[in-house]
Amino acid sequence: MSLWPDNDLTTRLGIRYPIIQAPMAGASTPALAIAVSTAGGLGSLGLAMHTQEALRNDCATVSAAGAPYNANFFVHSEPVDDPARAADARSLLAPYYRELGLGEVPDVVTATPSFNDTHLQAVLDLRPPVVSFHFGLPNADAFKAIKAAGLYTLSSATNVAEARELEARGVDAVIAQGFEAGGHRGTFSEPYERGHVGTLALVPQVVDAVSIPVIAAGGIGDGRGIAAALALGASAVQLGTAVLTCPESAAHPLYRRALNEARDDQTRITHAFSGRPARGLENRYLREMAGHEAHYPDFPILNTLTGPLRKASAIGNNTDFLSLWSGQSAVMSRNLPACELIQLLVKETESVLERLATAR
């Protein structure tokens, strides 16, 4: 008899284990998604920053492997045109540009489009088995078209109100993103501080509030965390930081080393890289930019302006200006191939479930 709880979600997703690899735009790869799905989980592609050609190529690569996968997109609001904040940001970044020999800070541009008609057409053409969204859901017509195509949909919520709104819009399952999670907060309500709810508290409240499956995310790094999430009523878990040190990820070697050396108290929520709140490991840039939040332009404008800093830092082999996105479970990172990591997580989870089942 299986130790895993009965789960309609795994059946619907076509996976053996209720373990989903977080999309992580910029760090996910087709190789990572294929490895996770081959091992029985659900691999994901973070496509928010992809060109159309790269988007279609990556989806085709994973699809050709015959494994289920999740295609993820950002659904952010269009940035507000604020010349004063744009000028402030350029002034703040200018010393770093000079230090790294990058010349003048470029004019403010938007280089990461929100989910749009071009993305929609790609989704309808490629038909990924699962389509997920961060920062809310697309407009009603686009979302209706995705649902009409029979694609399974996910979106992130950082509090109960967001989860209820997603269910009301017709999403198939909600990702309950606890405050411990690394990377961008999926919040789409204001102020974002309403999403400062830890995974242990958030998951059961969301489970009680909605009738759709709930996927737990945030601070889950081993089998103990997976078993705990299932005990709280989650139908599955989503892990991001745990897979960043897998060789199949696109994480820079310095990024991997920082994760391996991380402490439990080393992450911070910051707007300084992108203009949206995101959790990452503290470095020089985060320390020096602290307190300047009022001067940051909206996402994704600031993300575009800091892009050259991140690239130069990687080329220069230092972490001063890298966005080291990480959850609070980084200390649990293992340097294993993704397939081996999933197998280990399954073994760890089953060990915990067996111990709990036989406890007196």
Regions found by a protein language model. Name each.
Residues 96, 184-189, 193-215, 220-360:
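Conserved active-site-proximal phosphate/metal-binding subdomains
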Residues 1-209, 345:
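Active-site entrance/lid segments in N-terminal catalytic domains of soluble metabolic enzymes
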